[in-house]
Amino acid sequence: MKKGLLFILLAAASVCLPAQEKENAAKSYTVETNRFGANWFISGGIGAQMYFGDNDGKADFGKRLAPALDIAVGKWFTPGIGLRLAYNGLQAKGAAPSADARYAKGGTYSNGYYKQKWNMANFHGDVLLNLSNMLCGYNEDRIYSFIPYVGAGLAVSWSEPREKNLGINAGLINRFRLSPALDLNVELRGLLMKNAFGGASKEGMGGVTVGVTYKFKKRGWNAVPTVPMVPESQLNDM
């Protein structure tokens, strides 16, 4: 856990290095907190996801990949901290030893295990941390931003038998600036559940999606110059 956190911090800090000299020469400033209606965004992405649970190793890697869809709406409250409500899901695939298992579709793999397939959704809320802005300072023209997140929500299956379970979410958004209004996102995400779909004591879902984010107006942050403090003794001498 500590090694993983250290890796994230080092990776985020590394994106600051090329612009460090430029930022050191820039005028010192802070940013104003905008109104509640500012810095809202909507994002969407498509990709692939994989279920991890009982007998998941009984199917080949490619056979376990399922289509994935991401949709999210959120707001940045500061350049470094944001919240979002998100949907992830579409479909999941697995393997079962019996034709009577949940979501078994009748067909079999070459090893005799039955194919599983079900429609699912994961509704969750996340806390977003833009480490590029937090560690390197706010820069509205930054091309790449490193944004890990963590959250919780409810995972459900739309296929019979319908199941639902609380889940913990975590992931990483690699954000590439396309324009003041649009970003390209490459998102790596994970979901951890307890005995939700396949009967395992712990189950999970991992996915990778590519998509875009549209940022509504008013977007960005207003810079406020930082006024240096002058000691009272110097003021008296003036």
Where are these regions (language model features)?
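Cleavable N-terminal export/targeting peptides
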Residues: 1-33, 219-238
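Short glycine/proline- and aromatic-enriched beta-strand/turn motifs that initiate or cap beta-hairpins
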Residues: 20-74
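Short loop/turn motifs that connect adjacent beta-strands in outer-membrane beta-barrel proteins
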Residues: 28-39, 80, 133-146, 178-181, ...
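Residues that define the transmembrane beta-barrel architecture of outer-membrane proteins
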Residues: 38, 63-67, 119-123, 144, ...
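Residues on the lipid-exposed face of transmembrane beta-strands in outer-membrane beta-barrel proteins
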Residues: 44-48, 71-75, 125-131, 150-154, ...
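Outer-membrane beta-barrel translocator domains and adjoining extracellular loop/strand segments
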Residues: 54-60, 95-102, 139-141, 159-168, ...
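Gram-negative (and chloroplast) outer-membrane scaffold detector with strong preference
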Residues: 79-166
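Predominantly the C-terminal beta-signal and adjacent terminal strand-loop region
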Residues: 94-99, 177-238
